């Protein structure tokens, strides 16, 4: 189903790899699946630390996406960042503690929650800065990094090892992997039939900025790469620093994708509208002329979609194959 927004052109709002990261290959490999006598699970986290977890009862997550993964692994959360409620709509217990915004978490509130295990982000400076304090307090903490589906799958595997719910690893992990593999196979056939890969421009927009994103270290970029797309920001890195309409016109991508950052949806749409109005040459782009400019739903392409990763791939491939869902 399409939802139109008129901003000098129609942007369709859709509901909602192959590329290996060093983190996935080297820093989150499980060293020991399970010690049967102690139920202790030992693994290496994203900071290269050896972490041993023994049947935690009070788990806190410093990102909503990590809280979601823990739930998908059959666990419960006693404290998390506000996006666990606002973005992921998790069924947290009434007494769960809101630690605040992801970049402004309260260490005091975390201590109030009295966790025995904390899921933290190696990509978030504040999380990493808490490491020594948490270790000094005797609180077990593991750091993770998730940029694409394979990262998610590995974190889910570790979490289901800890919870003992390997059935949920099958349901929320391996089944999704099979779904994605089928979509990627379809994309290869699409490219073979077309004789060439589509070119794309990925733009992250908020109410105050619009920036180009390449294929690395972001959800949409990784998906587009896996589906065989050529992101013009990969070869024109200057676009990452300076969004030049002139350079975009020279590259003339087949598709343009906007993803929303932040919670101000109306402000984001207004900013996109103003960006287009200030650049009349925009209307000369092939993607615009062919109606291939899309505003993608935040929950599938800006946030970590976790068990909805397969759905996100399917909807994106639907656009690229002109069979939108």
Which residues does each predicted region cover?
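Bacterial Sec-exported substrate-binding components of ABC uptake systems
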Residues: 3, 15-65, 166-201, 318-325
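Structured C-terminal subdomain patch of bacterial secreted/periplasmic proteins
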Residues: 153-154, 158-161, 167-170, 258-325
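Proline-aspartate-enriched helix->loop->beta-strand connector
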Residues: 107-120, 139, 245-258
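Extracytoplasmic ligand-binding site segments that recognize negatively charged/polar headgroups
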Residues: 126-129, 145-158, 196-219, 266
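Alpha-helical, coiled-coil/dimerization segments enriched in small aliphatic residues
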Residues: 84-87, 211-240
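Short helix-initiation/N-cap motifs at beta->coil->alpha
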Residues: 45-46, 97-107, 236-244
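Sec-dependent signal peptide recognition
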Residues: 2-8
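A short, structured surface patch at a secondary-structure boundary
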Residues: 62-113, 117-123
